[in-house]
């Protein structure tokens, strides 16, 4: 059994985050009957480390809770997160590409109408391409 300080040291997760995970229903350590302190068993430490990995993968807390409540959903949760990250990557690639199209050096020369029009055109083209892929 570990106290919260030891759990923090073993996992690299702050006490505040460990308490937050408890509050969100992701973790339920036993309480010492004599002093009321939390006592973390090896399976609690493992759970904290599992949560740590899923949070590093940017999996939302509610989906982590679903995975804990229904372990058989884990594969679906990971697949859903992968798809979400792939969409974000595509969006970021579009934004980076658009940044490279901006040719002005001076903010005063930056024409918002021109670039908003280009953005709208790109968005329409992307929607059309996605529509033709769905057909």
Can you describe what each PLM-predicted range is?
Residues 128-135:
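Hydrophobic protein-protein interaction segments
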Residues 1-62:
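Basic helix-turn-helix/winged-helix DNA-binding cores
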Residues 52, 64-125:
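Short, charged amphipathic alpha-helical surface segments
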């Amino acid at each position: 059994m570990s106290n919260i300080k030891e759990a923090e040291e073993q996992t690299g997760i702050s006490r505040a985050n460990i308490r937050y995970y408890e509050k969100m229903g992701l973790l339920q350590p036993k309480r010492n009957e004599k002093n009321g302190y939390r006592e973390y068993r090896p399976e609690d430490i493992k759970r904290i480390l599992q949560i740590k990995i899923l949070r590093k993968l940017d999996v939302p807390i509610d989906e982590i809770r679903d995975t804990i409540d229904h372990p058989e959903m884990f594969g679906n949760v990971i697949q859903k997160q992968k798809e979400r990250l792939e969409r974000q990557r595509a969006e970021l690639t579009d934004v980076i590409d658009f940044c490279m199209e901006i040719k002005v050096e001076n903010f005063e020369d930056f024409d918002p109408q021109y670039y908003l029009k280009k953005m709208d055109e790109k968005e329409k083209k992307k929607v059309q391409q996605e529509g033709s892929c769905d057909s």
